[in-house]
């Protein structure tokens, strides 16, 4: 309801701070333009609890990305303060933040996802890797420090860079179209096909404004239904709630592979979730409204 006090959480201290600031501003501007009693709070530093206790919001729109918004700490804090919010629970956030844990759960339930394992100094030295492969931090977002490697030399460089962000995983490389689906609780939106500026949808491709987006994706009716069902099943298996996004690769044999689940997706002008909603005829303001009104 519009008489509720809403805090938009954005910023934070993760490597995705700048993207989060843009998401937060877009969401805050939308809420205010729609008549909501909304204020923005930068979650950086150590004063977040004090700010929330002072403001006493009814709901929080979580526009934090990376560890600050997706590792479960903010969800846990909001739940302890009994503040409804737009992201997943602490438990689900912890799981989805760690790509390896998420992948192991999905594989246990026979969901289609590329094979992967943790990458260590020992494994790099053994030189028994099948190329090409993807190397990335196990935790993190926006494809920061994510590499396609085709040789042991590239592998060593990628491992060195990715390890700056924590544990590193190496994943089977799957060639195909990059597809994504946004979800808000029981609402599953249209798939979006991304044609990245670079070889894959890396950090530069995401924020340069040069990638091409097809929304709707152009999948046939049967495949559109299939990818939406897979997205919702993955969302449910990992215990997600509120706003999330499921990313896929769609190969030339007609197979979908779940790449990851993002429990606090971007909400900038260039972000994928608003494009997914727009393909259903839901504009940005309406999408923001749906997300905040379904906060749990």
From Swiss-Prot:
Mg(2+) 2 binds at residues 260, 262. Binds 2 magnesium or manganese ions per subunit. It comes from the Bacteria. Its cofactor is Mg(2+); Mn(2+). Its EC number is 6.3.2.4. Belongs to the D-alanine--D-alanine ligase family. This is D-alanine--D-alanine ligase.
